[in-house]
């Protein structure tokens, strides 16, 4: 990691070691408080590789380190309620999903109007494909739908969205519902070869949650990050 940052990003070695030493000792508040400087550079490269298949969009992502993916979800729901969504506003939840995404919107402090769309497509042999129908995806065209929550790959089936579904959602955002906020939880994306997140396909509208715990087998460490492109819908709204 030390050599990588020096060789790939021309990091000042003294500043880098100083940041790491202070992080381990914990004698100061982190600066910047959302994520440390060199940590952000390193994680940006990692997300570009794993979430964008080494083909990231132009520009950089602003990152916010959190105490695991569940904490990231809590911060996001609170921020959405405080700044973007009111009680009764419509959101779409693509299921199966990580359980808190189902339970949190039901709390009295949020009371969002939740529309669930289910991955219930079958093949000709009656086998479950864990994919979504075009008719259900087209419900996102309504401007009454303010936010889309998706776990990709899904949890627990661990199926990625099909390329056709990804393309259909991107088209809907661009042509029908340009103010749709997409919150995508891509914790299992690192298990899928050549994975492309919504943060790669439509970064302007996307807020991404990624946790390191599953891929690195370190659930108890509670390490995750929220990623938002520097040019984004949320700042506009």
Regions inferred by a protein language model and the residue ranges of each:
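Walker B catalytic acidic pair
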Residues: 186
């Amino acid at each position: 990691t030390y050599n990588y940052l020096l060789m790939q990003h021309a990091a000042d070695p003294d500043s880098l070691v100083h940041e790491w030493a202070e992080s381990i000792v914990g004698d100061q508040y982190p600066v910047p408080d959302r994520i440390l400087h060199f940590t952000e550079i390193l994680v940006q490269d990692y997300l570009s590789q794993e979430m964008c298949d080494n083909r990231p969009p132009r520009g950089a992502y602003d990152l916010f380190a959190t105490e695991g993916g569940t904490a990231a979800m809590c911060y996001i729901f609170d921020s959405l309620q405080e700044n973007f969504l009111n009680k009764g506003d419509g959101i779409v939840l693509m299921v199966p999903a990580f359980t808190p995404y189902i339970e949190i919107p039901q709390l009295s402090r949020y009371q969002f109007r939740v529309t669930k769309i289910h991955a219930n497509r079958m093949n000709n042999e009656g086998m479950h494909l864990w994919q979504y129908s075009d008719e259900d995806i087209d419900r996102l065209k309504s401007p009454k739908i303010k936010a889309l929550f998706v776990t990709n790959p899904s949890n627990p089936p661990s199926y990625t969205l099909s390329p056709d579904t990804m393309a259909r959602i991107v088209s809907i955002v661009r042509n029908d519902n340009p103010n749709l906020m997409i919150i995508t939880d891509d914790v299992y994306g690192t298990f899928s070869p050549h994975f492309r997140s919504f943060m790669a396909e439509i970064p302007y509208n996307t807020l991404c949650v990624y946790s390191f715990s599953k891929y690195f087998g370190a659930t108890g460490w509670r390490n995750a990050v929220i990623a938002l492109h520097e040019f984004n819908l949320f700042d506009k709204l």
